[in-house]
Amino acid sequence: MGHMVNAIYQIDEFVNLGANSIETDVSFDDNANPEYTYRGIPCDCGRSCLKWENYNDFLKGLRSATTPGNSKYQSKLILVVFDLKTGSLYDNQASEAGKKLAKNLLKHYWNNGNNGGRAYIVLSIPDLNHYPLIKGFTDTLKQEGHPELLEKVGYDFSGNDAIGDVAKAYKKAGVSGHVWQSDGITNCLLRGLSRVKDAVANRDSGKGYINKVYYWTVDKRATTRDALDAGVDGVMTNYPDVIADVMNEAAYKNKVRLATYEDSPWVTFKK
């Protein structure tokens, strides 16, 4: 996953470096409308924190990059994580944010269900209290007559909360399946893999809530190896070419590969 891809031109940049997935920040205005693809300060070391687009413009650019037949089409780009910056919202605005997010995606990315972008979407929410965003989103797609698009949507709570607490939030949101569990910290700091291992154990137990586990932000070869050894399904990185190099090492090249569009992002990989 290419990290912090907030300008349209960066889509090609990160995919050309080897990413098959990107992460994009989404900020909201005071009325819970998704407004900009903007992170702001602070962000990862060695990166510009200030690149941005109007959210709807970014969606149109993303649609071009993920629609077969379009001149801008990038066949390798199969999944997009929207890092929803809901910290600016009151808890009681979460549902409204989900409704507006759904309408924006439906119009500007999915083209109202008419040959829109094909990438899978993960809605990544930083606060467990904002679980109503999910129901606002799913209910709106159903009300707009496009429940089939929910097959393209997954969910993530990104606040590094206890695994049991995350499970409770999903239960409240009515979610069972399509769950990616993130764990991580900015590349400026160190973080162990104990919670990643807990998430992997939940995924592999056959009775947990997690379908996939990803770790962020992974920029070094040693950290990449540690994450792969821990059994993650994906890593978020500022340097996709570094990840590609490690995956081609003798220890990994016959064990892991980049996912393609034919691989379901919602089905747990059985070893």
From Swiss-Prot:
**Top EC class for this record:** lyase
Question: Which SUPFAM superfamilies does UniProt cross-reference here?
Answer: PLC-like phosphodiesterases
Q: InterPro entries, alphabetically?
A: PLC-like_Pdiesterase_TIM-brl
Keywords from the named record? Cytolysis, Dermonecrotic toxin, Disulfide bond, Hemolysis, Lipid degradation, Lipid metabolism, Lyase, Magnesium, Metal-binding, Secreted, Toxin
Gene Ontology molecular function:
lyase activity; metal ion binding; phosphoric diester hydrolase activity; toxin activity
The keyword Disulfide bond belongs to this UniProt entry's keyword annotation: yes
Classification via Pfam families: GDPD_2 (PF13653)
Its Gene Ontology cellular component terms are: extracellular region
Q: Could you tell me what this protein is called?
A: Dermonecrotic toxin LhSicTox-alphaIA2bv
Q: Which organism is it from?
A: Loxosceles hirsuta
